[in-house]
């Protein structure tokens, strides 16, 4: 990875000069204090709370972690990272934090710009895209990423539990030319239409829209099935790699399974990333096949809810009508679309993916603050949610 030379920036609101450089192991204690000052004791990411994981990320050649240091005091004023992984050309912008004493001076934007200029440039280690999940308690974080070339792609209601349940917004920025190589999809289940129209307006695409068709019939249900959760991260990782030795047989960038859901009769296994602090879960892969587990989705989400999970998501190819229909049948909502997310094996084109979500808790949008560019995605989600959960009323003649 390209090394980062030190740069200086002046935050206009406070007239304080900061120096931006790569994070170092000696910064870990100060970084933990920074994240506590910004997020309190509820920050769910290991990047700001776990010294061992922070040390690993600082040394990771696929992660670029920058810090901003006040030139006058030497204290950390801000931090942000783009985290990647071997074999993938997707990065995640995470850990963006600016100390309360240094806000309103543009430091968040300066850090984001410095990261993106290096990881979305023209070098051999260039990423195809970088995504961010952004808080919606105020428009500030949304505007920071928007000003740095990120586009809104959806809303993820109840996605994380900080001091209370919060909704997040998905944003992404692509390297030049990537979006021009999206693979067209001939048809999609009709409930995806509001989301796809919104994404087309955001990206400014004017090509033909996919044909909308009714969702496929739901697979035979097994709602009464009994499942067990195995939370032994090292064991789950080993078993996952035994089941999926070929990396092309599954796709969920930057998520490593740490939990395993197993049917009592051994009919299937579902590998998931379960975050106990944030009380959310990502369904990553199923063995022997996603189709086998599709009929158990109700039992899977019920088991996760009983285990304290308030939000479940899955990443589904836009071209896979059957799996999308299966998730729709179990109350999952098409909440976001990641265009040009996965490259073809030959690298000629890119495939879109849909983020399907389901929350077991009441959604309260009264505390959600969205910028103008994000509002259409909130409207699209509400439309899809209403179509899923509100009955169609017929007026008697």
Give residue ranges: language-model regions.
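Short amphipathic alpha-helix that is part of the acyltransferase structural core
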Residues: 15-49, 67-70, 169, 177, ...
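Conserved GNAT acetyl-CoA-binding A-motif
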Residues: 119-135, 306-316
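Conserved catalytic-core motifs of GNAT/GCN5-like acyltransferases
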Residues: 131-133, 149-168, 333-347
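A conserved beta-strand-loop-helix scaffold within acyl/acetyltransferase catalytic domains
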Residues: 28, 32-100, 245-280, 286-288
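Compositionally biased, intrinsically disordered low-complexity segments enriched
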Residues: 2-18
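Non-catalytic interaction/regulatory modules that flank or connect domains
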Residues: 207-313
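C-terminal "cap" of GNAT-fold acetyltransferases
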Residues: 160-192, 343-381
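Conserved acetyl-CoA-binding loop-helix of GNAT-fold acetyltransferases
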Residues: 98, 104-120, 147, 290-303
């Amino acid at each position: 990875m390209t090394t980062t030379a030190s740069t200086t920036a002046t935050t206009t609101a406070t007239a304080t000069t900061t120096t931006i450089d790569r994070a170092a192991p000696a910064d870990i204690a100060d970084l933990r204090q920074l994240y506590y000052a910004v997020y309190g004791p509820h920050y769910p990411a290991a990047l700001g709370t776990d010294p061992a994981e922070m040390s690993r990320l600082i040394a990771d050649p696929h992660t670029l972690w920058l810090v901003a240091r006040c030139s006058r005091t030497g204290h950390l004023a801000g931090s942000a990272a783009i985290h990647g992984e071997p074999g993938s050309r997707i990065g995640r912008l995470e850990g963006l934090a600016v100390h309360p004493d240094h806000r309103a001076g543009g430091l968040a934007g300066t850090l984001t710009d410095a990261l993106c200029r290096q990881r979305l440039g023209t070098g051999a280690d260039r990423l195809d895209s970088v995504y961010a999940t952004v808080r919606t308690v105020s428009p500030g974080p949304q505007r920071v990423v928007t000003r740095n070339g990120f586009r809104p792609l959806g809303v993820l209601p109840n996605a994380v539990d900080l001091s209370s349940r919060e909704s997040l917004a998905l944003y992404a920025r692509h390297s030049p030319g990537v979006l021009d190589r999206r693979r067209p999809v001939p048809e999609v289940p009709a409930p995806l239409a509001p989301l796809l129209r919104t994404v087309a307006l955001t990206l400014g695409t004017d090509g033909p829209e996919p044909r909308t068709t009714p969702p496929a019939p739901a697979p035979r249900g097994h709602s009464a099935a009994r499942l067990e959760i195995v939370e032994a991260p090292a064991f789950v990782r080993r078993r996952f790699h035994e089941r999926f030795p070929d990396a092309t047989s599954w796709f969920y960038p930057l998520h490593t399974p740490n939990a395993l859901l197993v049917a009592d009769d051994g009919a299937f296994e579902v590998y998931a990333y379960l975050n106990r602090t944030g009380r959310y879960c990502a369904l990553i892969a199923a063995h022997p096949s996603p189709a086998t587990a599709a009929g158990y989705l109700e039992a899977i989400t019920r088991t996760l809810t009983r285990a304290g999970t308030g939000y479940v998501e899955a990443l589904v190819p836009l071209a896979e009508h059957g799996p999308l229909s299966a998730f729709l049948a179990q109350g999952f909502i098409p909440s976001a679309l990641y265009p040009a997310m996965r490259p073809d094996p030959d690298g000629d084109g890119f495939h879109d993916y849909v983020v399907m979500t389901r929350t077991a808790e009441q959604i309260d949008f009264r505390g959600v603050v969205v910028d103008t560019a994000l509002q259409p995605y909130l409207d699209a989600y509400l439309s899809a949610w209403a179509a899923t959960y509100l009955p169609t009323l017929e007026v008697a003649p």
